[in-house]
């Protein structure tokens, strides 16, 4: 047998492995998972019934065009069907965007630290990542990002709110930034946590999409809508971009169950608003308690908070796990903590209080 291995693309060497939030241990003391920014509530009313009914058609392929879901989204956002595209979560759509715009020799700009998938999906395409450090306040440095644009730039991600810091870019600064971006460079406003925003100065990205053909908005059903396990997200973009997304989509990638669950979730708006409101209240309670303990906590507009711990990051994460909650450490930088059930948040706050005393 030959010992020669099949030749693989050189661009794949050195790609970092995506690290999902660690699950709660099934056989240990850990009871709460605060590591993946999931919604702690069960599916919205009507979703389980819809999913159960859709399960009867497992033997059939899903509607590849997501016809009913696209119609629902078109009505919800007031956009043409031709300006919509769906995918396996917003990260799946983000990867399609890079495939459609960027290849070897091209550049993709994004803030860092930001969403962990950006460097992975960029390198898969063969493009080069241009990482622009956050400001000392953990916010996108849009001036520096604009300065980083070259004739090789093809796409720019603006994660708003930013994952994992929860910080936001406000309307005036985003407008100034967009004015500096060449019209042939695609700007992707990644708004996975849009529903949790309460700052009136943070714009809805759809406003900018309506005015600028080079703006694309990403949304997901994984966070506020609580469908993380079903993998469905979507993009709103002008027709050339949306059409390219449909071309690069994995055939039948969004299951029929995911499509039906997304539609049912959209129709449960009142319950969604109530649940998100409760999580926003918990977010404020957790952040206020942390600041009272002496922590520096960036103002979060997402469903998580960020603590910059540097070299103490892993020790803090281990302390949380031993107490019964799992958080998401970024070694050498900090931890992201999902706002979960009040009981879980209380456990986390006890750990943070004790840990703070040791610093």
From Swiss-Prot:
Stored Gene3D superfamilies: Aspartate Aminotransferase, domain 1, Type I PLP-dependent aspartate aminotransferase-like (Major domain)
Location of N6-(pyridoxal phosphate)lysine modifications: 223
Basic and acidic residues bias spans: 1-12
PROSITE patterns per the UniProt record, alphabetical: AA_TRANSFER_CLASS_2 (PS00599)
Disordered: annotated segments: 1-21
Catalytic reaction(s) noted: an aromatic L-alpha-amino acid + 2-oxoglutarate = an aromatic oxo-acid + L-glutamate
A GO molecular function held by the record: aromatic-amino-acid transaminase activity
Pfam families documented for this protein: Aminotran_1_2
Superkingdom per UniProt: Bacteria
Enzyme class: transferase
HAMAP family: HisC_aminotrans_2, Phe_aminotrans_2
Role played: Aminotransferase that catalyzes the conversion of aromatic amino acids and 2-oxoglutarate into corresponding aromatic oxo acids and L-glutamate.
Family stated for the protein in its record: Belongs to the class-II pyridoxal-phosphate-dependent aminotransferase family.
Record's protein name: Aromatic amino acid aminotransferase
Organism expressing this protein natively: Streptomyces coelicolor (strain ATCC BAA-471 / A3(2) / M145)
């Amino acid at each position: 047998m030959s010992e020669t291995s099949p030749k693989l693309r050189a661009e794949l060497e050195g790609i970092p492995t995506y690290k999902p939030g660690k699950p709660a241990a099934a056989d240990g003391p850990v009871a709460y998972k605060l590591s993946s920014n999931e919604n702690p509530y069960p599916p919205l009313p009507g979703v389980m019934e819809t999913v159960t009914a859709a399960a009867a058609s497992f033997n059939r392929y899903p509607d590849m065009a997501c016809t009913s879901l696209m119609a629902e989204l078109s009505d919800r956002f007031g956009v043409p069907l031709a300006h919509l595209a769906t995918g396996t979560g917003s990260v799946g759509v983000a990867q399609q965007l890079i495939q459609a715009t960027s290849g070897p020799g091209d550049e993709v700009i994004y803030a860092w630290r930001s969403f962990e998938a950006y460097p992975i999906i960029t390198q898969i395409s063969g493009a080069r990542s241009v990482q622009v450090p956050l400001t000392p306040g953990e916010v996108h440095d849009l001036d520096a990002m604009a300065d980083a644009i070259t004739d090789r730039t093809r796409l720019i991600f603006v994660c708003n709110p930013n994952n994992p810091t929860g910080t936001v870019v406000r309307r005036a600064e985003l407008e100034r930034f967009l004015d500096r971006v060449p019209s042939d460079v695609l700007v992707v406003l990644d708004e996975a946590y849009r529903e949790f925003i309460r700052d009136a100065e943070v714009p809805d990205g759809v406003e900018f999409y309506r005015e600028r053909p080079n703006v694309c908005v990403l949304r997901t059903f994984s966070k506020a809508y609580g469908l993380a396990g079903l993998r469905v997200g979507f993009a709103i973009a002008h027709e050339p971009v949306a059409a390219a997304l449909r071309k690069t989509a994995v055939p039948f990638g969004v299951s029929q169950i995911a499509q039906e669950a997304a539609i049912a979730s959209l129709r449960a708006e009142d319950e969604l608003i109530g649940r998100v409101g409760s999580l926003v209240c918990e977010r404020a309670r957790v952040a206020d308690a942390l600041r009272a303990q002496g922590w520096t906590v960036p103002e979060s507009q997402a469903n998580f908070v960020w603590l910059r711990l540097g070299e103490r990051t892993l020790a803090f994460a281990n302390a949380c796990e031993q107490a019964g909650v799992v958080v998401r450490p970024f070694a050498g930088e900090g931890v992201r903590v999902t706002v979960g059930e009040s009981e879980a948040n209380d456990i986390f706050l006890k750990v943070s209080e004790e840990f703070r005393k040791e610093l």
